[in-house]
């Protein structure tokens, strides 16, 4: 087969693949896009040093969205009602010792637009849950504790991104 035929075939396959992906709604994750009416975001949590609050604010700043210290008429508000991590035993080995755990990260969030005196609810209080499994080796207990901390941090970062995607979708309605 000549180089020209291979090139044409490759281009045709690439075009067909691109068309198939775009027709199913797939697109690369890009920057967070908020409607023009929302110029800033206020993040409220019971604990001002909440790691989830900090992750959300960091993601907002990374997307060039202003984070404000109080709600205003042109801002959206993310209210973190609560978040928690739970560890569950997923499986045990033949000696009845834990071999796998499941970590569940849950967050309860509400999204509003506008200032406190003229607020409209974009998303009612909703609970989101993410989970991840990991293997546990009792001979490496110290490493397992570090692994659990890393996985918890990854789940929290994923939760922050999920909440911001919800904000973007709800704000466009």
Predicted regions and their residues:
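Sec/Tat-exported extracytoplasmic proteins
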Residues: 60, 64, 111-115, 138, ...
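Bacterial N-terminal signal peptides that target proteins for export
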Residues: 1-13
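Surface-exposed short loop/turn segments
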Residues: 79-146
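Bacterial signal peptide processing site
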Residues: 25-28
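Acidic/histidine-rich, surface-exposed loop or edge segments in extracytoplasmic proteins
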Residues: 36-44, 140-145
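C-terminal motif of bacterial Sec signal peptides marking the signal peptidase cleavage site
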Residues: 19-23
């Amino acid at each position: 087969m000549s180089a020209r035929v291979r090139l044409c075939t490759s281009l045709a396959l690439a075009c067909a693949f691109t068309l198939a992906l775009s027709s199913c709604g797939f697109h690369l994750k890009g920057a967070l896009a908020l409607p023009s009416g929302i110029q800033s975001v206020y993040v409220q949590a019971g604990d001002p040093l909440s790691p989830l609050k900090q992750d959300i604010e960091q993601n907002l700043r990374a997307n060039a969205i202003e984070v404000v210290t109080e709600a205003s008429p042109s801002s959206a508000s993310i209210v973190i009602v609560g978040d928690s991590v739970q560890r569950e035993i997923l499986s045990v080995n033949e000696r009845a010792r834990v071999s796998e755990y499941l970590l569940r990260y849950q967050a309860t969030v509400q999204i509003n637009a506008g200032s406190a005196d003229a607020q409209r609810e974009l998303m009612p209080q909703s609970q989101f849950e993410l989970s991840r499994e990991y293997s546990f080796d009792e001979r490496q207990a110290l490493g397992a504790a570090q692994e659990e901390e890393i996985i918890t941090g990854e789940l929290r970062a994923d939760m922050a991104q999920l909440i911001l995607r919800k904000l973007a979708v709800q704000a466009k309605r």
